[in-house]
Amino acid sequence: MARAIMFQGTGSDVGKSVLVAGLCRVARNRGLKVRPFKPQNMSNNAAVSDDGGEIGRAQWLQALACGVPSSVHMNPVLLKPQTDMGSQLIVQGQVRGEARGRYYQELKPQLMAAVMESFAKVGDGADLVLVEGAGSPAEINLRAGDIANMGFATHADVPVVLVGDIDRGGVIASLVGTHTILPQEDRAMVRGFLINKFRGDISLFDDGLAAITRFTGWRSFGVVPWLKAVSRLPAEDSVVLERAVRGDKKALIVAVPMLPRIANFDDLDPLKAEPAVEVVMVPPGSSLPADAGLVVLPGTKSTIADLLALRENGWDRELVAHVKRGGHVLGICGGFQMLGRRISDPAGIEGNVRDIEGLGLLDIETMTEPEKVVRNVEAVSLLHDEPLEGYEIHIGRTSGPDMARPFARIGDHDDGAVSPDGRIMGTYLHGIFSADRFRHHFLRALGVEGGQMNYRESVEEALGELAEGLEASLDIDGLFALA
């Protein structure tokens, strides 16, 4: 078994995913063969791995940081929330059904075998595996059968480092409280802690570090400052969208309704990085900005439920008004399906609503099907005759007159639809704005100069800056010596 270290957090969104990505790049820079691993992830931000299955987008980024192809074994259990009570269960990249509440708790011990099999595969030939936990190990009500945090750590005998987020406040209580509540067996797995997202003079927290060590006996591996490079990396959790605020007005305003089950929202990251573009995330209860030039209906894990939510917020009427003002609309994946006249779900794949009227902005209809399309693709934009690389993750087959004006061509078949006037567009392709030349032509058609930067290079540069920041602020030698 490969040497490994596991990073667990005092809660969700403390920065574990980005820290692991950065440490993967640090290890790679030091000449180590390093691999990422996350036993269980809950996210609708999925990626198509290089071996053709679904994994969390964070593990895809971590594989990039390692300089290796992504694999379904880097995230063997993925939960994609689709209702308030249940999630789609994906095991080693493939859909295995729905996981609901207590049933999933009973299922977890059976999943440990798949987790350990994947862990062995990821570690094969590696010098170091950096493991990311999920949520918090202090949720002792979920400890029985756990595969995400201490259950995995104890089973695989992997040492743990706890991550605390000082930016949200209460980091001393979070770490000391976690120490207090953990059972002795789990507490013994923890070798130390680190503090993330510190703003200001780090020396002012010296007494805080000493206090944490005094209460817990754990050593400190350092304090990570607030690093600007993190903002240029794809985020995994939709909680970051809720914190987005409007900045200075730009040449193009792109409005994005925050659907309850929004998925693959990192499609928007290349647009956010454009100097002339402002992406405005519109929360429930707020109106679409009247000055938006483009509205993007993003991907969603539950198209029908989110279409109902869109109507409840009045965004359907505002979308019609936006179009009448001459605005443009782009629907991606589930957002594309919403733009049509009707969505039918005769098998009840998404729930109890079997048939629903769409927004009617494209003359298309969608029928859901049990078979899920999961693949990386190379395509050509038929709007601008530019190459695209993207990926598909969807259920459903779409047809109708507007499909005669496709958005893109993938091999020997067409994708998406465009309205007769060209202002309403839909596609099943995720990741299209990462293609620089396509983004340049797409924005130019909206009256904005963009696409000058190389987006993929900017992500690589951000990973490099993140690694430099971690090297400067953490005891990397001490951390890696734990494995």
Swiss-Prot record:
Which residues act catalytically here? 333, 430
Chain ranges passing through the membrane: none
Q: Does the keyword Transcription apply?
A: no
Show the Gene3D superfamilies listed in the entry: 3.40.50.880, P-loop containing nucleotide triphosphate hydrolases
User: Any keyword Phosphoprotein?
Assistant: no
Keywords recorded for this protein, A-Z: Cobalamin biosynthesis, Glutamine amidotransferase
In the record, the note on similarity to other proteins reads:
Belongs to the CobB/CobQ family. CobQ subfamily.
Task performed by this protein: Catalyzes amidations at positions B, D, E, and G on adenosylcobyrinic A,C-diamide. NH(2) groups are provided by glutamine, and one molecule of ATP is hydrogenolyzed for each amidation.
Q: What is the name of this protein?
A: Cobyric acid synthase
Q: State the organism's lineage.
A: Bacteria, Pseudomonadati, Pseudomonadota, Alphaproteobacteria, Hyphomicrobiales
